[in-house]
């Protein structure tokens, strides 16, 4: 079983993550069954978001009683500290847990930093100090924001689209993350369904140390 360590987080898991966006489209019973089946097959990293309707609720039920055996990453699209705390408390309640392993800013239009006026990064630091989150990450679709986040040294993980149809700029992001000891979580490994050869898609991702692909079951 191939394993991956997400940079300086120290999180080491099976090099297949579970993308929990699609489970919002199926029943609670089916979603819980699917998540538990993935767990039994050796998957330990599960990625969701506050914006994914009831995805967090479904994962919360799936891992109730075995929370310490999985890593859960979720996200907030908050624009200010007040929204951040509201989202975090809701996520913790939905997930039936008192901590999130990786709490990610969800595709912000800018790179949250201390003193930027949004209060977002300061809130994340406070949440980490309180033990409510363990690591601070960011997701994005913009190369400029992703690069700024890596070079800032403020983030422990980056989640970004990455597949075998990615170009040189995406490959450079992976290398930058490695240089900064930052975990790279690869979303859209099948490019939103454009790639149909899953074996080839995985073989591509497996070449890169520190890259964790998350797959969504459609």
Model-based region annotation:
Residues 50, 54, 76-79, 140-144, ...:
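Short beta->alpha linker loops
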Residues 1-70:
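N-terminal binding-site loop/beta-alpha segment at the start of enzyme catalytic domains
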Residues 61-63, 151-153, 173-175, 199-203:
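Short low-complexity, flexible loop/linker segments enriched in glycine and/or proline
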């Amino acid at each position: 079983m191939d394993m991956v360590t997400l940079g300086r987080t120290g999180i080491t898991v099976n090099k297949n993550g579970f993308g929990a966006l699609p489970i919002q489209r199926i029943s609670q019973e089916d979603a819980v069954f699917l998540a538990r089946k993935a767990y039994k097959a050796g998957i330990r990293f599960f990625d969701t978001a506050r914006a994914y309707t009831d995805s967090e609720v479904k994962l919360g039920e799936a891992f109730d009683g075995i929370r310490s055996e999985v890593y859960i990453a979720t996200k907030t699209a908050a624009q200010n500290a007040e929204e951040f705390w509201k989202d975090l408390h809701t996520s913790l309640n939905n997930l039936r847990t008192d901590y999130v392993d990786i709490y990610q800013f969800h595709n912000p239009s800018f790179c949250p930093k201390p003193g930027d006026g949004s209060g977002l990064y300061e809130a994340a630091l406070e949440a980490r100090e309180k033990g409510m989150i363990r690591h601070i990450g960011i997701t994005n679709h913009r190369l400029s924001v992703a690069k700024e986040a890596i070079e800032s040294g403020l983030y422990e993980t980056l989640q970004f689209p990455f597949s075998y149809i990615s170009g040189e700029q995406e490959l450079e992001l992976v290398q930058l993350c490695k240089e900064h000891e930052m975990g790279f979580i690869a979303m859209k490994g099948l490019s939103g369904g454009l790639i149909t050869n899953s074996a080839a898609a995985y073989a591509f991702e497996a070449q890169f140390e520190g890259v964790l692909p998350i797959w969504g079951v459609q």
